[in-house]
Amino acid sequence: MARSRCVHRVVHQAACIGVIGLSTSALTTCDFTGIFVAIQSEVPIKTPSIPGAIYGLVKAGSKLYATNGQLWKKNVAEEGKDWERESCFDSVIGDSRITSLAADNGENGVLVACILGKGAYKWSQGSADQTSGNPSALSGTEKALSVVGTGTSCVYLNHTDDKVGETSSSESGGMTASGETNEFCLHAGNGFLVTTKKVCVGSDGSPVAKSDGEEPVPPILAATDDGSGHVYILTKDKVYCKKVNQSEGKIQDCPQSAAAAPEPTGAHSVAHKVADAHSIAFFKNGSDEFLLIGGRQGYGEIKLERGSGSNGNGAQCVHLKEENVHDQTGWHEKGSTPKGSAEQYRSTIGRWAVSGIYVIKKSTSGGRGKRSTSTDCERPDLYVAVGDTNDTYTGLWRFDSAAQKWNRE
């Protein structure tokens, strides 16, 4: 994928408006009483500062941004504060809504929002977190349904038309068709792209499917990566691990060095055991790494193991093992929900459908005085979007590392 400022467009029909927007009203019908009521009385559920369902959350510069159709913001360093409305896109939204968010070069504070029926718009917070002018439209994106960030200066867009193509965000111009129809972009990074149909790799601005090893069985539901070139692909029944090989321009099963022990059979995929899985995230707490998989009731967790061999690009090979798969979190002290917090998790978000999982890396400086050790600072902030018809639970939740509890945001 080129590092030039660009926007790639991947086709999708109007009936498929985003995985995070998935309706979850039919996912859970369980009735819990007794012990759950007692636990909730010990940890009162907060009144949410963002009402309703959540369709996206990203970090851009020093701020977190979330959308429930409108835009909300929160300073990363100011823990315990409520979210506030951000009006930067209001002049464009009108009677429409934001469907998704992406951070274009996230550390620089550039935010991209997809506004249904209007297109994708970019806005920068500018110096000292001040507004840097009005939002600017990205050329040729009027039919965009959602936007997916890459962590660089490029974003992918899903469109209502029947073409796959690209257009530059810094230049005006048309679209060049270059791929299949009826695809939906799920996740992307520097040099790779995951759609509902396949995994693609490329650095020329037009990634193509070129894969070795075990192939994920479509439809692909979601994907994430660990920042070291490993991509984790979620399907109805399994999770697959693939390695981006930039030098050869392909996606492959993680190879072992000649000196390493042979990899276990089936190390590149594993059954995840999560019912109605539809979201996935990578979570690292110190040296412990996990995949988090949102589903019908709460989210599951898979602990990752890295082999001793190098994959040739500086990162150890990742193994997926059945004994490390859990259909619920709360089983491991270094997990996303520590073992001691499992009961409180089960009485709250563990009862309901999790439609989105957002892991936000922390900085060890600036506004982290509450954290007593550098080890604590290694634990990222964890947010989940609960989607259900029960207003007590629907919306954004966060795990409070200090209180060791889940609660509303």
From Swiss-Prot:
The keyword Membrane applies. This is Uncharacterized lipoprotein TP_0133. Residues 1-29 form the signal peptide. Transmembrane segments: none annotated. It is a lipid-anchor. A lipid is attached at residue 30 (N-palmitoyl cysteine). It comes from the Bacteria. It is found in: Cell membrane. GO terms for cellular component: plasma membrane. Belongs to the TP013X lipoprotein family. The keyword Lipoprotein applies. Keywords: Cell membrane, Lipoprotein, Membrane, Palmitate, Signal. A lipid is attached at residue 30 (S-diacylglycerol cysteine).
